[in-house]
Amino acid sequence: MKGRAVYIKTFGCQMNEHDSERMLGILGTKGFIEVDEPKKADIVIFNTCAIRHKAEQKFFSSLGRVKHLKKKNPQLKIIVAGCSAQLQGEKLLNKLPYIDYIIGPDNLHVIENIIENQVSHRIFTDENPEVANINLPVKRKDCVKAWVNIIYGCNNYCTYCVVPYTRGKERSRPVDDIIKEISLLAEQGYKEVTLLGQNVNSYKDGNTNFPLLLEKVEKIEGIKRIRFITSHPKDLSKELVDVMKDYKKICEHIHLPLQAGSNKILKLMNRKYTYEEYFEKICWLREAIPDIAITSDIIVGFPQEQHEDFEKTINALKEIRFDGIFAFKFSPRLGTAAAKLDGHISEEVKAARLIEVLKLQDEITERKNKRLEGKIQEVLVEGKDEEGFTTGKTRTNKVVKIYSDIKAGEIVNVKIAKTHRHSLEGDIIST
């Protein structure tokens, strides 16, 4: 290819965000620069999400807006990557022939061959058992905090989820590769790392499980904060809780998806735990780490969710009092077991239940944040927001707007002067 400009649009989770960083890293080694508009690009990449219908609709809408660019520039390459690409590869090409290439999550490395015109076909969706051993270059969006993949794929097969079909079976990265990557990040001045996986608790390389991996990362000089996402509740162990309590770099925050408060629904979801078992683990966490922030995911309107099942989810929110949640209406995904269940809930009922869940959680979050007024929080400064204010995050992952002008990467103590539903404000008291 002669042109060397790339535009990339990312949909979905942190794994996708990091996959986009890796694609940009590959292209960067070939002299590509990232541009902010598709019309300026020689390659347009859509890194897609298939977890919900809404994410797919956003992708198709964005894709439709670049179709005309092909007529103006026949050399333009349009690449669809990510989970929708994996699920619908051939179907997408047949339906939308102006797409040039389809790349699944296990095959990001083929972008190098594509730009060098060294490929003989257009669809790259084969499962790659070696994906955990391939260390790709990364062009990171941030200079303070970084994502680091530790495990790929998922073995849980929750009935509503396409991830095992789009990202394959679990494959853990070699521990030495992870430590080497994080050590390099520390040398480059990064202060925080987030360990990524569909289920980080399943990490296993030889004798190193996830708690032992955290211990190794803790020892890397220069890294000040460690986070991880996502944890499956069934695999949350007391060993992990003890490590979180004992090691000061591990932030006091965990994202632990509940999904529903009804045992009937949890069983239909194939979550492999009961609400009582989940709540016991919440108690472990809060007993060991009293100030821990716990966030979660909730799905409303799952097939066969009766009013009493939904009420159990409402009661769970009241009992647990999460710091925040991501809540969604159930979205049937083609090929999943849940899509084939009887008793699907109407869109009207799902919408009403979602509103009720979000309203309740907003009240809980607002009250919890209010308690932080006048308290001192350690904040890692991340940069400026759209209004020009200095912003950062607490160890509990709460966004803080800081009145003073401090450079990114500094860790400061902030006295919280004002709280909002989704953010805090305050003044620096020491650096």
Swiss-Prot record:
Cofactor: [4Fe-4S] cluster
Binding site for [4Fe-4S] cluster 2: C154, C158, C161
Keywords per UniProt: 4Fe-4S, Cytoplasm, Iron, Iron-sulfur, Metal-binding, S-adenosyl-L-methionine, Transferase, tRNA processing
Limits of the TRAM domain: 370-430
Stretches assigned to coiled coil: none
UniProt-listed Pfam families: Radical_SAM, TRAM, UPF0004
Positions of the Radical SAM core domain: 140-367
Quaternary structure and partners: Monomer.
Family the UniProt entry places it in: Belongs to the methylthiotransferase family. MiaB subfamily.
Protein known as: tRNA-2-methylthio-N(6)-dimethylallyladenosine synthase
